[in-house]
Amino acid sequence: MASALRVRFAPSPTGYLHIGGARTALFNYLYARRFGGTFILRIEDTDLERSTEASLKAILDGLKWLDIDWDEGPEKGGPFPPYFQTQRLDTYRQHVDQLIAAGKAYRCYCTQEELKERRALAEKEGRTFKYEGTCRERKDAPEGRSHVVRFKMPSQEGSVSFEDLVLGKITKEYSDLDDWVMMRGDGIPLYNYGCVIDDHLMEITLVSRGQEHVNSTFPQLMLYQALGWTPPQFAHLPLILGPDREKLSKRKHKEADVMLHKANGILPEALLNFVIRLGWSHGNDEVISRQQMIEWFDFKDVGSTSGVWNPEKLLWLNQHYLKTLPPADIAGRLAPFLADKGHPLPAGDPRLEHFVLALRERAKTLDEMATMAVPYLQQGVTLDEKAAAKHLTADSLKLVRQVRDEAAALPEWSVASLDSVIKTVSERAGVGMGKVAQPIRVAITGNTVSPGIGETLLLMGKDEALRRLDAALARG
């Protein structure tokens, strides 16, 4: 095994990128970046019925959106191609043949019906089913009968153990393992076999994956031993639980879909910040930048306790990044959400940045921000009649007229210049600014709630704001 650090993320393209998969990819990526290693993406596409190009694209798109960039793999190439398991079948067959020739694996001709009967009998007798080794010493090859290839476990007593970077030392007795299936009759490798061959040939030095794979590690270690290969280190990550404290799953939890968060207006910076803390922490730090993640992350700091999905914390982090990232950056990301709501704005339109500055204190997602911005982009306004009756009186409309005329005369609109007009009119009338601002707010938004009045006028744009003020004045 090579001494240089090499880690991998090996998803199956049978659906979208799962939050658990994204965390595994992130941890491996950060570890490689911190310690000068290489991060490999390998596609385990041997489930021929469920693997699809659409799922592969969804996984790659999810990683790209999160900016988890791989060094070797699909679209990149590398020194150990191919990076798709279905393109490596000859390699798996070669090693299976070697193991059979060495007496460390064998062909099993037991039918599914026979195995089903034995499994039912074991259940009836209250014992755990283990393959009894029926074909272990079989020499004949029944004509026309399909077979699988099984690993031949040692017959003597013994145990297999490993030191997990997260869980510590774990041991299992040989007697708890049976002769597991390595390869199907059609030459497709099963998980425990294929990943060992690939991890060794791709010189992987550390395998990080979810705790649900702990039990898979023992047969894999036996295979490493049979092949005379040095196994990598292992780090098994804690489970992620949904808000209901059940294991986060594609079937039960919509939160499991990485790209759904993008569609809902969550920023990738916020999602990464949230996900890294599902099992890892750095003191009491809540907000962690990408550079800090790279500088701080280590598997020795990963806990064994399950992380629980907290939607409020994700929204809190998202609003933090909406407030602190450059407004021009957020403006570019806001544009697609406005377009989806029927209000496309060209790239660089100054209103985009105005919306960000005015709305980011209240909006928790890009989608919320876009929803708040829509009234400023619509033609015309629907007045709340109660608000209009209270604030658009004959006396208040006189103040509205003054604001309208003085604002129209401004050579350039800005928050400062518009606030100055409101202040001047209120001082001249001897009333508080609210007595002037609130009628203006109702006239242009239809209700009594909005950002600051200068910001609100600026967001509306000069032409539309004046049209709405004129419409309100026409009521009087």
Task: Give the residues covered by each predicted segment.
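N-terminal Rossmann-like or analogous alpha/beta NTP/dinucleotide-binding catalytic cores
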Residues: 2-124, 215-229
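Glycine- and acidic
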Residues: 8-13, 41-45, 202-207, 256, ...
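Short, acidic loop-beta-alpha module within alpha/beta folds
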Residues: 23-26, 269, 434
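Residue-level signal for inorganic ion chemistry
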Residues: 28, 59, 99, 103, ...
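Catalytic adenosine-cofactor/nucleotide-binding cores of aminoacyl-tRNA synthetases and other
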Residues: 48, 215, 227-383, 390, ...
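Residue patterns forming the tRNA-binding/recognition surfaces of aminoacyl-tRNA synthetases
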Residues: 93-98, 102-104, 136, 270, ...
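Active-site cores that bind ATP or allylic diphosphates and position pyrophosphate for catalysis
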Residues: 106-236, 241-248, 257, 261, ...
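C-terminal accessory/binding modules appended to enzymatic or scaffolding proteins
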Residues: 331, 388-446
